[in-house]
């Protein structure tokens, strides 16, 4: 062994060839943390000092190559002063450059995935050979930053500026054949031939068959584009990418600007340009929020994984109530490998459920994401039925009937009598108390809530609701089933609206107050979309359904009358009474028409103002900032209450629930991180300015205490 560390080893293979292997002890994947970087420095120095070494193969001892930097280190690193952060970045880059400058040829053997710093390590090698099943990419823009280990410098010099911009700005993973096509790798081989191919390639480079110095040289020089080509390439890309990313996600455009600024420099000067831009992005609130989201997501997955120890495997599922929701649940279950019975009380419901599943499957086949044979297999995994005949073998039943407590209780009691004693029953309710529904059951310990969001196939969140009598086994099994379905489960405790809807309705409450104060709902939508929401509150209410919103608001008002009950008629009441139910019947706040593709498109409908006139009680001067505050303060304070009440266990889960469940702007990180970004003390002072709007705007005593003590939700 030439070098041995905890993350990297260097050992002799044959004829002066050595293998530099990444294999981080105690971890399932390789990543660039401080330890790995320090050991890479030592390994490179060791190789450089050994004159007997003729070539280096870089490999991984794990199923993946390197997944990138250790994101957990970003939080503290990014708090460093700019100059210190730039110096640290350049010091790390010196390691990669020294590896690139070795007086012997180098080959990277890429298995599994090589992302971020993992791919940047490969780019520093002279040659890259890739397993046919591997994927490579630079996903840093998803964290609000761009590649910082030479990715913006080496990749454009290797595959051309246009291709590099596409890879870096999109941040996606790229398959082996695509990587070979653009020249990011030199060869693609079967996974079991990777080591052999890398060895043959390095031997060819040592013998002079392949000129490694000629291969290396373009990465050390300026970009081969003249001034006109640069202008056309970069200016066009900046305009297009800015339109795609939007103003709240600066990283993709900054990456292009960095490539452009460094285009006329050699490698070392170009790396300085990269470092300066990287640090600039690292200090943005978008980067801090998106990195926080990534870490929250990791925490969420870790918590969900902990339930695996006691969870039972769901081999056969069932859904009660077909229709669009039931069909969506059936599709999701069957497409992820769990066969499911789909029961309804009539043929129409069954037909609707099957049509929904078939529509989703056909869509995947049409886009080339699924074969016709796989589609047939998934459809065979959905068995429609009008009876309980086969329910004796079911492990978990999802009840998805109408949102009415009496109907749900009757259906749940009925199915409980038809299943095994240990079958888990889960209600897909959006607002009704699980403990209330459990009163109809003989085995309430086997009962939980399992709240899917619409449309099921697109929305990543599932709330798993623990009732007063729910067992940990029932909770764990439901969490495991949700994960198996490809969802991100969050366990919450029971209360009206659970987490997501309990927080969403105060947001809608703020919206209703604005309309009643004479603020045009179209203006409100525009302001909130500019703030970062995927759609404004009026449009969202139309999509959800005015009737659904009306019912949900009443449930929430009954559950929290002190702050959510409003005796005045509101815009929701006016539209509901006028039978303007939103997208579902073509008229809500907006009118809806089918476009050429048959997709519902919203259009202005002047007649709605007549409907809303009776619920406008004043004409108040309200700024755009006021609009944001009326809505966001109510939402944020209810999130704080959910955390304080123990409805959700951690700030991370609360924030992820809102990002995954209602599209809270990711670049703002979630409600609690949004409070942190303002400052807890500043947020409390801001809320106090709107105290006249009612109890929804009154900070809790605990939040005031946090403000007084200079505390935050995320350290």
Swiss-Prot record:
Q: Where is this site: Important for catalytic activity?
A: 120, 140
Active-site residues (renumbered): 451 (for 3-hydroxyacyl-coa dehydrogenase activity)
Pathway(s) where this gene product acts? Lipid metabolism; fatty acid beta-oxidation
Extract the ranges annotated as region (Enoyl-CoA hydratase/isomerase). 1-190
Does Isomerase show up as a keyword for this record?
Answer: yes
Give the EC number(s) under which this enzyme is classified: 4.2.1.17, 5.1.2.3, 5.3.3.8, 1.1.1.35
Q: Which CDD domains match?
A: crotonase-like
A GO molecular-function annotation: 3-hydroxybutyryl-CoA epimerase activity
Q: What Gene Ontology terms describe where this protein resides (cellular component)? A: fatty acid beta-oxidation multienzyme complex
Name the Pfam families on file.
3HCDH, 3HCDH_N, ECH_1
Family matches, as NCBIfam families: FadB (TIGR02437), PRK11730.1 (NF008727)
Q: Please report the name of this protein according to its UniProt entry.
A: Fatty acid oxidation complex subunit alpha
* Protein source organism: Pseudomonas fluorescens (strain SBW25)
């Amino acid at each position: 062994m030439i070098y041995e560390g905890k993350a990297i080893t260097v050992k002799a293979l044959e004829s002066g060839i050595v293998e530099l292997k990444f294999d981080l002890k105690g971890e399932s994947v390789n990543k660039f943390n401080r330890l790995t970087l320090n050991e890479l420095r030592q390994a490179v120095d060791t190789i450089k000092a050994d004159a007997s070494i003729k070539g280096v193969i870089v490999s991984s001892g794990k199923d993946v190559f390197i997944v990138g930097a250790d994101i957990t280190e970003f939080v503290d690193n990014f708090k460093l002063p700019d100059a210190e952060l730039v110096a640290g970045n350049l010091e790390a880059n010196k390691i990669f450059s020294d590896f690139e400058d070795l007086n012997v040829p180098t080959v990277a053997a890429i298995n599994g995935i090589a992302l971020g710093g993992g791919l940047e390590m490969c780019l520093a090698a002279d040659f890259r050979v890739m397993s046919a099943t591997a994927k490579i990419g630079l996903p840093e823009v998803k964290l609000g930053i761009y590649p910082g280990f030479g990715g913006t410098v080496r990749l454009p010099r290797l595959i051309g500026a246009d291709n590099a911009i596409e890879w870096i700005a999109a941040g996606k993973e790229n398959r082996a054949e695509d990587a070979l096509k653009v020249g990011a790798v030199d060869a693609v081989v079967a996974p079991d031939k990777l080591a052999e191919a890398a060895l043959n390639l390095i031997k060819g480079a040592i013998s002079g068959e392949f000129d490694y110095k000629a291969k290396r040289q373009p990465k050390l020089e300026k970009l081969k584009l003249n001034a006109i080509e640069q202008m056309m390439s970069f200016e066009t890309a900046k305009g297009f990418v800015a339109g795609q990313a939007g103003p709240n996600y600066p990283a993709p455009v900054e990456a292009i600007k960095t490539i452009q600024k460094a285009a006329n420099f050699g490698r070392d000067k170009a790396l300085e340009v990269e470092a300066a831009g990287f640090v600039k992005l690292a200090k943005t609130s978008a980067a801090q929020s998106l990195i926080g989201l990534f870490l929250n997501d990791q925490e969420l997955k870790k918590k969900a994984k902990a339930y695996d120890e006691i969870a039972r495997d769901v081999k056969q599922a069932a859904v009660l109530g077909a229709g669009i929701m039931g069909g969506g649940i059936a599709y999701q279950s069957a497409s992820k490998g769990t066969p499911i019975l789909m029961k309804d009380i009539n043929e129409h419901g069954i037909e609707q459920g099957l049509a929904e599943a078939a529509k989703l499957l056909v869509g995947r086949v049409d886009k080339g994401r699924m074969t016709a044979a796989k589609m047939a297999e998934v459809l065979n995994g959905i068995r429609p039925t009008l009876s309980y005949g086969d329910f004796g073998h079911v492990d978990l039943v999802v009840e998805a009937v109408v949102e009415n407590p009496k109907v749900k209780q009757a259906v749940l009691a009925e199915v409980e009598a038809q299943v095994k004693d240990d079958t888990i029953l889960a209600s897909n309710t959006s607002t009704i108390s699980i403990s209330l529904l459990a009163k109809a059951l003989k085995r309430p310990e086997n009962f939980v809530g399992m709240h899917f969001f619409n449309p099921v196939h697109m929305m990543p969140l599932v709330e798993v609701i623990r009732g007063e009598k729910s067992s940990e086994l029932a909770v764990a099994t439901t969490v495991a089933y949700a994960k198996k379905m490809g969802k991100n489960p969050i366990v919450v405790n029971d209360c009206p609206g659970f987490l997501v809807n309990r927080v969403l309705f105060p947001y809608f409450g703020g919206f209703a107050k604005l309309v009643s104060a004479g603020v045009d709902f179209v203006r409100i939508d525009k302001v909130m979309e500019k703030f970062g929401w995927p759609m404004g509150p009026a449009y969202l209410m139309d999509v959800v359904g005015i009737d659904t919103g009306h019912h949900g608001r009443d449930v929430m008002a009954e559950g929290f009358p002190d702050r959510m009950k409003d005796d005045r008629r509101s815009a929701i009441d006016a539209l509901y009474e006028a039978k303007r139910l939103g997208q579902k019947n073509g008229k809500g706040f907006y009118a809806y028409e089918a476009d050429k593709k048959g997709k519902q498109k919203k259009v202005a409908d002047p007649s709605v103002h007549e409907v809303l006139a009776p619920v406008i009680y004043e004409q108040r001067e309200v700024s755009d900032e006021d609009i944001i505050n009326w809505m966001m303060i109510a939402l944020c304070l209810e999130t704080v209450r959910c955390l304080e009440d123990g409805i959700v266990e951690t700030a991370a889960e609360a924030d992820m629930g809102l990002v995954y469940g209602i599209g809270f702007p990711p670049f703002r990180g979630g409600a609690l991180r949004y409070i942190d970004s303002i400052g807890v003390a500043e947020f409390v002072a801001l809320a106090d300015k709107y105290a006249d709007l009612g109890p929804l705007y009154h900070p809790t005593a605990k939040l005031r205490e946090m403000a007084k003590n200079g505390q935050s939700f995320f350290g």
